[in-house]
Amino acid sequence: MNNTEYYDRLGVSKDASQDDIKKAYRKMSKKYHPDINKEAGAEQKYKDVQEAYETLSDSQKRAAYDQYGAAGAQGGFGGGAGGFGGFDGGGFGGFEDIFSSFFGGGGSRNPNAPRQGDDLQYRVNLSFEEAVFGVEKEVSYNREATCGTCLGSGAKPGTAPVTCRKCHGSGVMTIDTQTPLGMMRRQVTCDICHGSGKEIKEPCQTCHGTGHEKQAHKVSVKIPAGVETGQQIRLQGQGEAGFNGGPYGDLFVILNVLPSKQFERNGSTIYYSLDISFTQAALGDTVEIPTVHGDVEMAIPAGTQTGKTFRLKGKGAPKLRGGGQGDQHVTVNIVTPTKLNDAQREALQAFAEASGDKMLHPKKKGFFDKVKDALEDI
């Protein structure tokens, strides 16, 4: 067996996270569950998935598997030349106990203990203004819920699961294997109860013995003012159903703020770019500035330069931590005209002369130049 076969069984890459492995296991386990999939070979595939997950879900077993393959994960290393001689493997009192301790016995976990359900993620888009002022959104999604027919037991109403006759409720079987190092002991998932410790003689017809069913779910999310892209809101108990009576997992709402056509934002500060003419910059003016709180008047002092930034106090977004309101920064951009009529050109030339600017005056426009300008203006 190569060192990627277990990953292939679950359909994940070798660098998959534990969360990815867990999700893939649940998907494949449900796909090949003998109570659901009656196709030939489905039961064997189900066992293969269980075997792969048993190793990859344990960080120490996974590390051994990545380095040595299945033999490493199961404790079956072969002895090298002049290797671990002197171990006769008598009984089970020595070497195999070291490996059992190193790899962590799977039987120590109680398969019947309540376990919390999986967490879910949901992405919500917000307009620029919704992120600034806050909003309440209703989100709809599908989740694994406790089966309404069997109430999560997996058994047909009127019946109940019984203790597994093979593993006696432990969910695992102990297998002893003779190796060059001596007798090695390993634990595998029980092939009768598939690790649950229980047998369901008469499965529920709604959930086919899983105890869960897919359900459309809605929940209202209160999004506070001042949030930003990437922030999360945790809704406790709105994830997927638990196991053996365990609680539901949580829902994490991930926020994405859509861009504004006129504003930019960083934290509680909002940024706005203002175009003004060079006469407004030179002589000064009072202009109306849009903000998320409404238009306000702002004075442009005479002699304002391109790149000058003005601050409108309290016109930004709320501060999530510490309270208070941010500011809006207005950056000025002086627009140079690209076309001048004769009167404008002469006025500017007179201004240049009065300022003492030394310029090479452009030649006076002739008849054809004026015709060309007139055509461009049509």
UniProtKB/Swiss-Prot annotation:
Binding locations of Zn(2+) 2: C164, C167, C190, C193
Cofactor(s) the record lists: Zn(2+)
GO cellular component: a single term: cytoplasm
Amino acids binding Zn(2+) 1: C147, C150, C204, C207
InterPro entries, per database record: DnaJ (IPR012724), DnaJ_C (IPR002939), DnaJ_domain (IPR001623), DnaJ_domain_CS (IPR018253), HSP40/DnaJ_pept-bd (IPR008971), HSP_DnaJ_Cys-rich_dom (IPR001305), HSP_DnaJ_Cys-rich_dom_sf (IPR036410), J_dom_sf (IPR036869)
Repeat positions for CXXCXGXG motif: 147-154, 164-171, 190-197, 204-211
Alphabetically ordered keywords of this record: Chaperone, Cytoplasm, DNA replication, Metal-binding, Repeat, Stress response, Zinc, Zinc-finger
SMART domains documented for this protein: DnaJ
Domain J positions: 5-69
One example GO MF annotation: ATP binding
Annotated localization: Cytoplasm
Zinc finger extent (CR-type): 134-216
One of the GO BP terms on file: protein refolding
Keyword Repressor: no
One Pfam family linked to the record: DnaJ_C
Cofactor note: Binds 2 Zn(2+) ions per monomer.
Major localization class: cytoplasm
Similarity-based family: Belongs to the DnaJ family.
Domain notes: The J domain is necessary and sufficient to stimulate DnaK ATPase activity. Zinc center 1 plays an important role in the autonomous, DnaK-independent chaperone activity of DnaJ. Zinc center 2 is essential for interaction with DnaK and for DnaJ activity.
NCBIfam families: DnaJ_bact, PRK10767.1, PRK14276.1
Subunit structure: Homodimer.
HAMAP family in the record: DnaJ
Function recorded in the entry: Participates actively in the response to hyperosmotic and heat shock by preventing the aggregation of stress-denatured proteins and by disaggregating proteins, also in an autonomous, DnaK-independent fashion. Unfolded proteins bind initially to DnaJ; upon interaction with the DnaJ-bound protein, DnaK hydrolyzes its bound ATP, resulting in the formation of a stable complex. GrpE releases ADP from DnaK; ATP binding to DnaK triggers the release of the substrate protein, thus completing the reaction cycle.
Name under which the protein is recorded: Chaperone protein DnaJ
Originating species: Streptococcus pyogenes serotype M6 (strain ATCC BAA-946 / MGAS10394)
